[in-house]
C-alpha cells in the first residue's frame, strides 16, 4: 500500500454485494487531491472501464480543485471528464459520487457535480471557491452563514441527495445501486 499514497486517484473494479462496480477514490493527501492531466486520464479510464464492463461507477471525491501548476492542462480536465461522464450516462449506467471532505474547485464544478446520486459525508466542505476567497470578494460588510458550504447546507439547497456517515456508505450505496439497476430494467 505504500505506493498508493503517491497517487492522486485510485481506480478499482470489483463487486459490491454481488454487483459488479467500477470505483474511483481521490487521495487528498497527494497535492491536496488536485486534478492534473494524469488524474483526468484516470477518471476517463475509469468511465471507459465502467462502460466496457457495463458497471455502475462510484466516485469518492476529495479535492481542492484543479492542479494549478499544470495551468491550462489541468483546467482542460474539467470538460474532458464531463464529456466522459456524459458517455456513461448515454449507456444508462448509474453514477454515484460521495463528496468527502473537502470537495471544492473544479472537481465540484465538473465530474463530481453531475452524478445521478450525490452523497455527502457529514460536515464535509463542498463548494467551488473556498470560504476565505468568497469572504475577501464580498468584503467585510457581509458575513457568510456559519454552516456555509457544509454538506448539511448543500443538502438543504438541493445539491446533495443525502448525507451518510462513512460507516453506513457501503450499505447505502449498495441499496441505491440495486434500486437504480432495477429502474433501468423496467425502462
Model-found features: residue ranges?
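Redox-cofactor binding/interface segments in oxidoreductases and associated redox assembly factors
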Residues: 33, 59, 120
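Conserved catalytic cores of soluble enzyme domains
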Residues: 65-185
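Glycine/charged-rich beta-loop-alpha catalytic/anionic-binding loops adjacent to active sites
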Residues: 25-32, 61-66, 90-94
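A structural preference for short, pocket-lining loop segments at secondary-structure junctions
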Residues: 16-25, 42-67
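Glycine-rich anion/phosphate-binding loops
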Residues: 6-7, 33-48
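Flexible beta-alpha connector loops of hexameric P-loop NTPases
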Residues: 31-38, 69-73
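Short, small-residue-biased leader/transition segments that mark boundaries at the very start
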Residues: 1-5
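Short acidic-hydrophobic surface loop/beta-edge motif
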Residues: 10-16
Amino acid at each position: 500500500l505504500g505506493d498508493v499514497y503517491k497517487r492522486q486517484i485510485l481506480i478499482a473494479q470489483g463487486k459490491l454485494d454481488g454487483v459488479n462496480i467500477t470505483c474511483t477514490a481521490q487521495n487528498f493527501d497527494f497535492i491536496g487531491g488536485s486534478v492534473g492531466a494524469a488524474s483526468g486520464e484516470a477518471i476517463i479510464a475509469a468511465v471507459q472501464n465502467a462502460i466496457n464492463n457495463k458497471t455502475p461507477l462510484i466516485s469518492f471525491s476529495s479535492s481542492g480543485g484543479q492542479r494549478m501548476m499544470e495551468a491550462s492542462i489541468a483546467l482542460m480536465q474539467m470538460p474532458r471528464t464531463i464529456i466522459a461522464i456524459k458517455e456513461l450516462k448515454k449507456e444508462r449506467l448509474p453514477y454515484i459520487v460521495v463528496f468527502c471532505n473537502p470537495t471544492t474547485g473544479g472537481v465540484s464544478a465538473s465530474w463530481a457535480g453531475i452524478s445521478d446520486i450525490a452523497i455527502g459525508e457529514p460536515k464535509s466542505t463542498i463548494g467551488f471557491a473556498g470560504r476565505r476567497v468568497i469572504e475577501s470578494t464580498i468584503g467585510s460588510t457581509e458575513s457568510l452563514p456559519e454552516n456555509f458550504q457544509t454538506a448539511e447546507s448543500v443538502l438543504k439547497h438541493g445539491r446533495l441527495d443525502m448525507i451518510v456517515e462513512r460507516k453506513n456508505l457501503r450499505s447505502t450505496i449498495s441499496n441505491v445501486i440495486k434500486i437504480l439497476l432495477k429502474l433501468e430494467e423496467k425502462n
